[in-house]
Amino acid sequence: MTDLHPDLVRILIDQEEIQKRVKELADQISNDFKGVKRLYIIGILKGAFIFLADLTRHITVPHVVDFMALSSYGRTTESGAVRILMDLREPIEGQHILIVEDIVDTGHTLGYLLNILEGRNPASLHTCALVKKQRDIEAAPVDYLGFEIPDVWVVGYGLDYADLYRTLPYVAELKSEVYSD
C-alpha cells in the first residue's frame, strides 16, 4: 500500500490505474492517427510533462513532441487571463496536432489555446487530458480523456500546488488547509 503524504486527503487515482489508462489512451490515439505521416504532439508545461512522457512512449504512429507554456493560474486561484509564456519552435500549418494537458478545470486555458492554434491552420486539432473536473460549466472539448474527477484541488503525476507534489506517482486530493491562506 502507498503511504499517503500528510498534506493529502485521499488518493483519487493510483499509479496502476494511471498507467493502465495511459496505455489505453495511447492505443486509441495510435489507432485514430494510423496512416498519418506525422503526429505533432504539444505538451503543455509544466503540468503535462510526466503524463506526456508516459503517453508518448506508448504511441506507435510517427510523432514529434514540442512544448508550450501558458499561464492562467496564480499560486492558488484562476486569474481568468491566459498568457503564452513559451511558444512552439516551428509552424504547425498542415500538421495533425494533439494537445496534451494535465488537467481541464474550467476549460478556459484549453479553449484559449484551441483558438490560438486553430488560427495557425493545422490539418487537424485534437486534445488529450489526464483529468477533467466534474463541473457544471461547459469546458473546452477533450477528445482523449484519462479520468473525470471531483471538483477538488488535486496534485501528483504532474499536477502541483506552488510547484510542489508534482512527482507523486498518483493523483490525490490536497487538504484545503494547505492551499487556504
What residues fall within each predicted segment?
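PRPP-associated nucleotide enzymes
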Residues: 1-181
